[in-house]
Amino acid sequence: MNRTTAVGRIAVFAATLSAALLVTANSTAAPAGPRENWTSATSPHFYKTTSLNALGRVADSAANDGSALRLTLKAGAAANPGNGIEIASRNNYGFGSYSTRMKAADCSAQPRAGVVTGAFTYATDHSDRNGNGLPDNDEIDVEWLCAQPEVIYLTLWTDYNASNDQLRKVSRVIDLRAGRIISTCFSTTFGECVAVSSAENQPTSVAAIPGYNSSTQYYEYGFDWSATGVHFYLVNASGARVTLWDYRGPASRIPTKQSIFMQNAWHTTNWDPYGFQARERPNRDLHAHVDWTQLPG
C-alpha cells in the first residue's frame, strides 16, 4: 500500500501485534490452515478493526455458496486505511500459502474516486532486525485502485520510516486486461524505480485476461511465501492458475516476520492510477466483496 497513509493504522494495530511479530516465519511452507467461507459477517478467524463503515453478509449468485462478505466504505469516508473498512486475522501467520476469492470496490459511477482495495500481510514493530537503519515494515500486498480496475499492484515491503519516507520495497504493476507489465521496481523512496535482477523479474510477460475487471468479477488471488521468494498468482475464469510474479530476489528484500492477514477498502488522496489523477472522496457507499479467505497452517 501507499505508505504515506499507513501511519494512522500503525497506531491502531500496535496493541494487536504481539511479541509473535518478532519471530521469523517458519523456514518451510505449512499446510493449509483456517478457511473462512464467510457464512456470517463475524468470524472466529478475523475481526473488524475499527468501528467505522460496515461489514455484512449479502446474497451473491457469483459467490461459490451464493453469499459473500461485503465490506462497505461509506460515502464521504476520510483518507487513510484507519478510516476505511478493514478486517484482520486474529492470529499471526508466517511462510505458507494465502489466497482469497474477491471483487474489489466498484467506483464506475465516480471514475475519479480515490479508493484502494487490498489483501495483504502486515507486521511492523519499529525494530531494525536487518540492521539497515530503517524501521522494519514487513508486508506482502495485492491491491487495486478502483479508478483503474484492470491494473493490479503487487508489493513486498521490508522497511519504512514514516518520519522521512525512506523505505525498501520491490513492486510489480500489471495491466491484466492488456497483458502488459507496467513496471517491476526496487524503491528506496516513493516514486523511485530502480531496475531489478532477472531473478526478481519473472515471468517477463503475463498473458492478457480479456475483459479483466477486478471490481465486477470474482477472481481467486493468492501468493505462496517462503524464505526464498513470493509467488503471486491469479486463478482465471477457466480455473487455470496464472503466475503474475515469481519473485526470487535477495533475502534482504523478502519479508520474514509473522504477520496478520488483512483485507480492506479505503480512501486515498495521494495514490493516482497510471495516466490520470483520481483522488475524489467517495460520494456514495462503495463495496468490496469477499467470497472466501484461506490462511496458511
How would you name each of these model-derived features?
Residues 2, 25-26, 231-233:
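Conserved short hydrophobic patches within well-ordered secondary structure
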Residues 2-13:
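Bacterial N-terminal signal peptides that target proteins for export
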Residues 22-32:
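C-terminal region of N-terminal signal peptides and the immediate post-cleavage residues
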Residues 30-297:
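GH16 jelly-roll
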